[in-house]
Structures are given as structure tokens and as C-alpha cells.
Amino acid sequence: MKEVIAIIRPKNMKKTRDVLESLGFPSFNATRVLGRGKQRAIIDEVTIPSPSPEIDEVRGTMRYIPKRMIQITVEDPDVQLVVEAIMKVNHTGKIGDGKIFVCPVDDAMRIRTGDRGTEAL
């Protein structure tokens, strides 16, 4: 089993959800997160007014950008399909498209039934 973690733009959440559901993956977690990559700023990504832009420039800081984090655990043969689907929906070729991480999952347990492994998915 693997956990696929994707950080995407909020505006792409519905399309991503719809594609995953259409492929047979309706179960996942989605969380509102704040973050940034290596870029210093993303023009037009957010419209949150800064209380003091001069201070931001002087300190060299950057506010974090609102994103969505999707976490979905799938069986090994399904990883490529899920990753490709997320990539297809979210790829624009522009800074801020997001990131995808694939992590190993040793075990899973369904609390209600006690099912383990892939049966718990």
C-alpha cells in the first residue's frame, strides 16, 4: 500500500475529486493548508491584502499561499493511475501547480471492524 499526498491549488479541488471518484477512488482526505515552494511570490494566486507590504519587502518574508492537501491510500498497482490523474487535472506548467508525494504504508486498520491491510481501505 502507498499513501499519495498531493498539494494542489484550491480551485482545482472539485475537478480533482471528480476525476478520482470517476476512477473508483471516492475515499480520501482533503485539508485546507498554507504553504509555499521555492518561489518568492505567486502573482494573482491570492488576493489577501497585506497589512504592511513595506515590512514584507524589508524582512524578505512571504505569506503562505492557501492550498489543498489530498491524502489517499491505495494498493500498489493503483498508485500510477492516481498520480497520473492528479497530474493531469493540476498541471499548467506554471509555478504553484503543486507537489505529489508517494509514501509507503506498512499497515492500515479499520477501527469499526478491525479489518487490516488492504481490506481496511
From Swiss-Prot:
It comes from the Archaea. The keyword Nucleotide-binding does not apply. Keywords: Nitrogen fixation, Transcription, Transcription regulation. GO terms for molecular function: ATP binding; enzyme regulator activity. GO terms for cellular component: cytosol. GO terms for biological process: nitrogen fixation; regulation of nitrogen utilization. The keyword Membrane does not apply. Belongs to the P(II) protein family. This is Nitrogen fixation nifHD region GlnB-like protein 2. It comes from Methanothermobacter marburgensis (strain ATCC BAA-927 / DSM 2133 / JCM 14651 / NBRC 100331 / OCM 82 / Marburg) (Methanobacterium thermoautotrophicum). The gene is glnBB.
